[in-house]
């Protein structure tokens, strides 16, 4: 296949947004869910996230304390996955939210907001897979943000290919104006 339309969701959207910048001739178009195109910041994004969100923000935590989160997730894989794969969280009140919660706390707390977004049998599949493979590799994606930032220093950070951006009504990521960065953009919520 010489050319394709690339589709991404969440951190996969970050990969897809950069495809036309890195491999323009291979891209017919893009479709992304949840995460908008974010032009390269002037400083290392991990430093920027730490300044904006503090040391317990999950991406900062993965970079500043390698291995800690992965070990905590592995200690109780079922609890961790059950705590993060939730829906209807916005219906719950803030009084049930532990204060100062970090990503590591998601592996340790018993307070579960909202509803599990899958059956217990479906959760078993995820638990089994992560018990087999562990969490180090997924955490490594976030530890590569600084390196990706370095590697993209010489790129023009403007997407010229046709792009579709879809936000979920209850996404944590809110729509942003990408008109200066994405030339041919259609947005749906």
Where in this protein do the model-derived segments appear?
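Flexible "cap/lid" subdomain of the alpha/beta-hydrolase fold that forms the substrate-access gate
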Residues: 1-7, 11-189
